[in-house]
Each structure stands twice: as C-alpha cells, then as structure tokens.
Amino acid sequence: QIIDQLENIGVEPKIVTLKKDEEVYDCHLAKVEYGVTLLFVNVTESVNATKMRQEFFSNVSHELKTPMTSIRGYSELLQAGMINDPKVRKQSLDKIQKEVDHMSQLIGDILMISRLENKDIEVIKHPVHLQPIVDDILESLKVEIEKRKIKVICDLTPQTYLANHQHVQQLMNNLINNAVKYNKQKGNLNIHSYLVDQDYIIEVSDTGRGISLIDQGRVFERFFRCDAGRDKETGGTGLGLAIVKHIVQYYKGTIHLESELGKGTTFKVVLPIIKDSL
C-alpha cells in the first residue's frame, strides 16, 4: 500500500492509514531532496475513541427511541379511549411509567459520567449505612428478581463509611443491576461488605453468563459493552461500570473483577477507611 503511494507521490505530502495486528497507524509520506520520508503515527487510541463515541450515541439513540415509541403508542390509545378495561389501562400506565423510569436512568447516567470526568461532583460526605441503600435497590428490582427466581444472599457489615450518599447509591445500583440483568434463571446474587484492616470491602457476585478474558480488560471503559450483539436483549449504554470505576477512584479505592464464562462474575470494591469514617 505504501509502495503504491510512493509511486504517485508529488510535491504535496500524503497520509496513508495502515492497520497491523489491530493497531492503526497514519503514515505521513513526503518528498525530500534525496528521497522520501515516512513518519508512522500510532492513532489506534484516537480511532477507538471515535468508534466508541459513535457506538455510544447509536446506543443512546436506540435506548431513547424505543421507550419514546412505546410511551407514544400507549398514550395515543389511552387518549383515544381505545382501552376501556381497567386492568388493561393499569397495565398500559405501568408500562408508560417503566419506560419513563428507563429514560430517567439513562439521562442520569449520561449526566453522572460527564460530572465525574470533569471532576464536577458533590464532595459533602456523611456516614453512610449500606443496608438501607441495598434494600431500596433490591426492592426496585423485586419484580425481575422474583420473575427469574434469583436467590439473593445479603450479608453487610453494620459499620458506616464516610462518603457521599449519592455516590454509594449509584455504585451499588450499577453493580446490583448488572448482577441481576446478566444473571441466569434461578441464579444466585450475593452481596457482601466487610472490614479488613484499614479497608471497607464490598463484593457483588452473580452466577450468570460471565465475562470473557478479552472483555474483562475493557469493561470499565466508557461506552464499552460486552459483546454488543448479545447485549441488545438487555439494553444499556456502556456507562454503568465506567461510573463505578470513577466513583471508586474518587475515594482512592480499587475495583477488581473475577469472572468465568458460563459461571458468573464477582466485582470487589476496596475502599480505604479514612479517619472518622466508621
């Protein structure tokens, strides 16, 4: 490819894009007095970032369009008086509410990731109890958990952690939602928190599909979704785990992932305990 370009190179420099071993390079070709210069620039990161942004906006567009279509359809039927059965009317209104909640969550995730990346986040901290936060999240997922007969095992330390309540709620919500979303029928969901030395540790495990070794290295990236084709049935924008990682890093903690395809996934969050956090 470069040789072909060299044969046609004129006075003006040329840029040729090359791919090798999943890496992308821009090759800058220019004539000099005694020949030709070639400058190779690795643009893989830039190309991947552009691709991920395009996929993200495509996902967001789809995630917004689907509930909007549903809301409009049910609203038009109700407005036209075409749904007279009280039970069916309630089901229609419940569906509208569910879609509104979905859009609200989507918009909230987009705003959250933007604030985290721009370091524009709330810093007021209070002692946070994990139990009521987890209870509220499980209650919001009760229908899905019961429908799929997922067994929930919850063992949380009564100790508090000094943090912003919204951050802890967002962190737990994203981890638990994923554990339910990707779990198998009659699977297990384990939520634990405990203290080890000067660390406050949270573990969320499921017995679902698992994450491949290749994807494990990228699950915390913005916009990334494991096996995008397979995820169409579950939805999502690829922001949940990116938000989790940003929150954990804000508290100078770490997050670890253990997973095996077909057996499940465990996320382990380690947060350092600071003075007066208990």
What do these predicted regions represent?
Residues 79-87:
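Short acidic helix/loop segment immediately C-terminal to the autophosphorylated histidine
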Residues 98-103, 107:
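Short alpha-helical segment of the dimerization/phosphotransfer core of two-component systems
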Residues 211-223:
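Short conserved segment of the HATPase_c
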Residues 252-253:
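Conserved glycine-rich
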